[in-house]
């Protein structure tokens, strides 16, 4: 297992936000909003998958993830780490290596041929599984994987997102109702704070981004997107 250092949570969040800007994983576009998978219009977009291409950044982020899990969940609370298809798979491998745990990955749907598996790798019945994704918005995709693991006999009480939107009350309710504790390193508030500090955008763009973070569904509805999220 990798030797862990337990940095201050706020420092980790700030550093991850800075690294995401440095590798150009973050994009602001208030005048031409992005369309998210949920149907929302958003002035912000983030591609955490880029982390896998920057070894020094990737290593630091995964060290932070491992230290957060051990500090907040415990050292002996998991039997394996699961990544969701597809973005979560490499991060599950990186985290499993650091925690010295086996790894599995979960398909969005059974593969439809052969043994029709949805879970790949070995997961004993009753295994305590930590699910990791690169990011989560309102928790919907993570629960696709959590539900599959539970249906196969695994136990999931914790989830890990390297980046968490942190702006939807629906997400808090979903994790609470699903009896899963979500751990995360950075949020959009951390990213916006770095953008302001480093003056990366003009004031109007930053104001629009802040307006979105304060009332995302209202902003989406005004800009051609959905004004409410699906409950499932």
Swiss-Prot record:
<keyword id="KW-0328">Glycosyltransferase</keyword>
<dbReference type="GO" id="GO:0019856">
    <property type="term" value="P:pyrimidine nucleobase biosynthetic process"/>
</dbReference>
<keyword id="KW-0808">Transferase</keyword>
<dbReference type="GO" id="GO:0004588">
    <property type="term" value="F:orotate phosphoribosyltransferase activity"/>
</dbReference>
<comment type="function">
    <text>Catalyzes the transfer of a ribosyl phosphate group from 5-phosphoribose 1-diphosphate to orotate, leading to the formation of orotidine monophosphate (OMP).</text>
</comment>
<dbReference type="InterPro" id="IPR029057">
    <property type="entry name" value="PRTase-like"/>
</dbReference>
<dbReference type="Pfam" id="PF00156">
    <property type="entry name" value="Pribosyltran"/>
</dbReference>
<dbReference type="InterPro" id="IPR004467">
    <property type="entry name" value="Or_phspho_trans_dom"/>
</dbReference>
<dbReference type="GO" id="GO:0044205">
    <property type="term" value="P:'de novo' UMP biosynthetic process"/>
</dbReference>
<protein>
    <recommendedName>
        <fullName>Orotate phosphoribosyltransferase</fullName>
        <ecNumber>2.4.2.10</ecNumber>
    </recommendedName>
</protein>
<feature type="binding site">
    <location>
        <position position="137"/>
    </location>
    <ligand>
        <name>orotate</name>
    </ligand>
</feature>
<keyword id="KW-0665">Pyrimidine biosynthesis</keyword>
<comment type="subunit">
    <text>Homodimer.</text>
</comment>
<dbReference type="InterPro" id="IPR000836">
    <property type="entry name" value="PRibTrfase_dom"/>
</dbReference>
<comment type="similarity">
    <text>Belongs to the purine/pyrimidine phosphoribosyltransferase family. PyrE subfamily.</text>
</comment>
<comment type="pathway">
    <text>Pyrimidine metabolism; UMP biosynthesis via de novo pathway; UMP from orotate: step 1/2.</text>
</comment>
<dbReference type="GO" id="GO:0000287">
    <property type="term" value="F:magnesium ion binding"/>
</dbReference>
<feature type="binding site">
    <location>
        <position position="111"/>
    </location>
    <ligand>
        <name>5-phospho-alpha-D-ribose 1-diphosphate</name>
    </ligand>
</feature>
<feature type="binding site" description="in other chain">
    <location>
        <position position="108"/>
    </location>
    <ligand>
        <name>5-phospho-alpha-D-ribose 1-diphosphate</name>
    </ligand>
</feature>
<feature type="binding site" description="in other chain">
    <location>
        <begin position="133"/>
        <end position="141"/>
    </location>
    <ligand>
        <name>5-phospho-alpha-D-ribose 1-diphosphate</name>
    </ligand>
</feature>
<dbReference type="InterPro" id="IPR023031">
    <property type="entry name" value="OPRT"/>
</dbReference>
<feature type="binding site">
    <location>
        <position position="107"/>
    </location>
    <ligand>
        <name>5-phospho-alpha-D-ribose 1-diphosphate</name>
    </ligand>
</feature>
<feature type="binding site">
    <location>
        <position position="113"/>
    </location>
    <ligand>
        <name>5-phospho-alpha-D-ribose 1-diphosphate</name>
    </ligand>
</feature>
<keyword id="KW-0460">Magnesium</keyword>
């Amino acid at each position: 297992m990798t030797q862990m250092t337990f940095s201050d949570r706020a420092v980790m969040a700030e550093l991850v936000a800075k690294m995401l800007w440095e590798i150009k994983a973050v994009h602001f576009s208030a005048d031409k909003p992005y369309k998210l998978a949920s149907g929302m219009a958003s002035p912000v977009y983030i591609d955490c998958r880029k982390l896998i291409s920057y070894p020094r950044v990737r290593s630091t982020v995964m060290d932070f993830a491992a230290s957060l899990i051990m500090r907040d969940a415990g050292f002996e609370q998991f039997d394996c780490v699961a990544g969701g298809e597809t973005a979560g798979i490499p991060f599950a491998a990186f985290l499993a290596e650091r925690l010295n745990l086996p790894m599995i990955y979960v398909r969005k749907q059974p593969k439809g041929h052969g043994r029709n598996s949805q879970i790949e790798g070995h997961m004993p019945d009753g295994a305590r599984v930590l699910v990791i994704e690169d990011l989560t918005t309102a928790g919907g995709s993570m629960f696709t994987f959590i539900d599959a693991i539970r249906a196969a006999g695994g136990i999931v009480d914790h989830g890990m997102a390297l980046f968490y939107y942190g702006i939807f009350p629906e997400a808090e309710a979903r994790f609470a109702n699903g009896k899963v504790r979500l751990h995360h390193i950075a949020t959009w508030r951390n990213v916006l704070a770095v953008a302001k500090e480093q003056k990366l955008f003009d004031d109007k763009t930053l104001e629009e981004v802040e307006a979105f973070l304060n009332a995302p569904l209202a902003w989406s509805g005004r800009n051609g997107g959905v004004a409410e999220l699906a409950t499932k």
